[in-house]
Design a protein with these regions (language model features):
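FAD-binding core/adjacent interface of flavoenzyme oxidoreductases
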Residues: 1-3, 69-147
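Beta1-alpha1 glycine-rich phosphate/pyrophosphate-binding loop at the start
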Residues: 1-70
Length: 147
């Protein structure tokens, strides 16, 4: 009996765990980035205790010992559940027998969207710009603010 074709959308904890567990399937893991970010340690990058490379690992390196897993770096445009195909931005459509959705999470402000400005959270989209600004202060007063 041929192996099932499993497509996993998302290279976070859920996607990694599913891909590593499904040894009797042909797995295609799709993510927009080529790395897994260990988000519980983002605060240590934000405080300069760790560098970004210490908490981000290439997905292909993680799955080097898993020959049943193929990693595709692309953006999912649509999912045709009837035809069982995932449409991607830059790659050919990928057929599936089983689809696992593990795209990650977003912050919830429980209907109080104004809170986002004061409490942006420690996601890469909020940490990186602050780190870049801090690494290139333009004046001595802003330099003091970041140190």
């Amino acid at each position: 009996m041929p192996h099932k074709q499993v497509v996993i959308i998302g290279g976070g904890f859920g996607g990694l765990t599913a891909a590593q567990s499904l040894r009797d399937a042909d797995v295609v893991l799709i993510d927009r980035t080529n790395h897994h970010l260990f988000q519980p340690l983002l605060y240590q990058v934000a405080t300069s205790a760790l560098s970004p490379g210490d908490i981000a690992w290439p997905l292909r390196t993680i799955f080097r010992r898993y020959p049943h897993v193929r990693v595709v770096m692309d953006e999912v445009l649509s999912i045709d559940r009837t035809a069982r195909v995932v449409q991607l931005r830059d790659s050919r459509p990928i057929p599936f027998d089983i689809l696992i959705m593990a795209p990650g999470s977003r912050h919830s402000y429980f209907g109080r969207d104004a809170w986002e400005e004061s409490a942006p959270g420690l996601k890469p989209s909020t940490v990186r710009p602050g780190w870049r600004r801090a690494s290139r202060p333009t004046s001595s007063s802003s330099r003091r603010c970041w140190t």
